[in-house]
Amino acid sequence: MQRTELMTWLQQELAVDMFKDYAPNGLQLQGKSDIGHITCAVTASLAAIEAAIENGSDLLLVHHGWFWKSEPTVITDWKFKRIQTAMQAGLNIAGYHLPLDAHPQLGNNAQLARVLGLKPLPAKATAAVGVADAAAAAQPPGFGRFG
């Protein structure tokens, strides 16, 4: 698939224009024009970039991308290393913050709820962005293994 076609689809599917965010949503670093393999991660860290390259990915799709509102704008040190590594491999990096928080099927909250077997509340039941479950309040806190 062509990068421009995929970015257009993501822009529309995730309703990016509906969100006022702290960071840019969409393509943050342009790489190869053909996208055949995608790696997903929470953050565009050096470890995630290296894993995407090792996996033969053409796109690293992340929840926490780069260039946050209050972040320094200079490209030095860790930011330089990440950008350099991705550019040398032709790796595209796209980040979607609030759009992935809110999407009812593809979003982080929706996917976590699916894995946990939770059912979403009706849209009118909560003002919060994302997916909630009425049973969540009755569940003890802590971590567990699923799957």
Please place each PLM-identified region on the residue numbering.
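Hydrophobic structural segments
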Residues: M1-G147
